[in-house]
Amino acid sequence: MKILLANPRGFCAGVSRAVETVEKVLEVEKSPVYVRHEVVHNKVVVDSLKKKGVVFVKEVDEVPDDAVCIFSAHGVSLKVEEAAAKKNLVLYDATCPLVTKVHRGVRLASNNDAECILIGHKGHPEVQGTMGQYRSKKGAIYLIESEEDLNKLTIKDPDNLYYATQTTLSVDETQGIIQALKDKYPNIKGPKKEDICYATQNRQTAIKAMLKHIDVLVVVGSQNSSNSNRLKELATLAGIDAYLVDNPKDVDKLWFDNKKVCGVSAGASAPEYLVQQIISQISKVCSTEVEVEEFEGIKEEVYFPLPRLLKQKIGTGKVE
């Protein structure tokens, strides 16, 4: 059997920055180091950091006063920021800069008392953080996941209306919802460029290009990873068997029965070493050597610098 490796795949610049932030903070700060929420949605990465001494918490209320705390790549609400400030935490913000960009747009809408429509998945930590940027008492922020949700909305002032999106959505679905928004509310304003991040778009584009060459797809990523699930969905919608896995032990021989070409990709929070472990396991369960070929795609050269406070600590070598 042949394996086609999607390109690009795996870690994006935001995830690389978040993981490196945690690892560097472990070097420059005294233990324990607390992280609010999973720093990225990947079980293998989180478990690895736990072994290094990181303490993951759901809320900053669980973090002792004056302790070291890191915000995850998904971002947090203004309320969480205020709670952290009251506890006098040594705070490192690993929020992805592309999520921060969405936050700025929502805060601007709030400052202008504009109603705001956020396209995203209910309960996702990024969505919770973005919704929590809105403070206007005169306007309101609404969460929608589909065009059906849009039809249920009642907007007070269509001429003072803004939209934003979660960064890890399906590109195709989101474009449809945005167009429906513009059709219903011609004066709606939004970001100059879609908020769906470059990495999410590039990984989805890579899968689409590969679909006609494969008859099964394995996506390396965790079940709670939004962007990994969107990759799997692309294959499923095209009628191709697709599986989401973040542990080599979960690879099943039956997935590859009567299959000639297996596509392999990875969500933006899955490390490359895990991709290689999954490939080795596929070869093992198939009881044969597999031919591995890189499928040509977009080259990514995006880099996000570490948080300012962390760069200062690294530069001076001081632990205050």
From Swiss-Prot:
One of its GO terms (biological process) is terpenoid biosynthetic process. InterPro entries: LytB/IspH. The keyword Isomerase does not apply. Transmembrane segments: none annotated. It catalyses: isopentenyl diphosphate + 2 oxidized [2Fe-2S]-[ferredoxin] + H2O = (2E)-4-hydroxy-3-methylbut-2-enyl diphosphate + 2 reduced [2Fe-2S]-[ferredoxin] + 2 H(+); dimethylallyl diphosphate + 2 oxidized [2Fe-2S]-[ferredoxin] + H2O = (2E)-4-hydroxy-3-methylbut-2-enyl diphosphate + 2 reduced [2Fe-2S]-[ferredoxin] + 2 H(+). The active site is at 126 (proton donor). [4Fe-4S] cluster binds at residues 12, 96, 197. Isopentenyl diphosphate binds at residues 41, 74, 124, 225-227, 269. Dimethylallyl diphosphate binds at residues 41, 74, 124, 225-227, 269. Binds 1 [4Fe-4S] cluster per subunit. Pathway: Isoprenoid biosynthesis; dimethylallyl diphosphate biosynthesis; dimethylallyl diphosphate from (2E)-4-hydroxy-3-methylbutenyl diphosphate: step 1/1; Isoprenoid biosynthesis; isopentenyl diphosphate biosynthesis via DXP pathway; isopentenyl diphosphate from 1-deoxy-D-xylulose 5-phosphate: step 6/6. Catalyzes the conversion of 1-hydroxy-2-methyl-2-(E)-butenyl 4-diphosphate (HMBPP) into a mixture of isopentenyl diphosphate (IPP) and dimethylallyl diphosphate (DMAPP). Acts in the terminal step of the DOXP/MEP pathway for isoprenoid precursor biosynthesis. Belongs to the IspH family. This is 4-hydroxy-3-methylbut-2-enyl diphosphate reductase. It comes from Francisella tularensis subsp. novicida (strain U112). The lineage of its organism: Bacteria, Pseudomonadati, Pseudomonadota, Gammaproteobacteria, Thiotrichales. The gene is ispH.
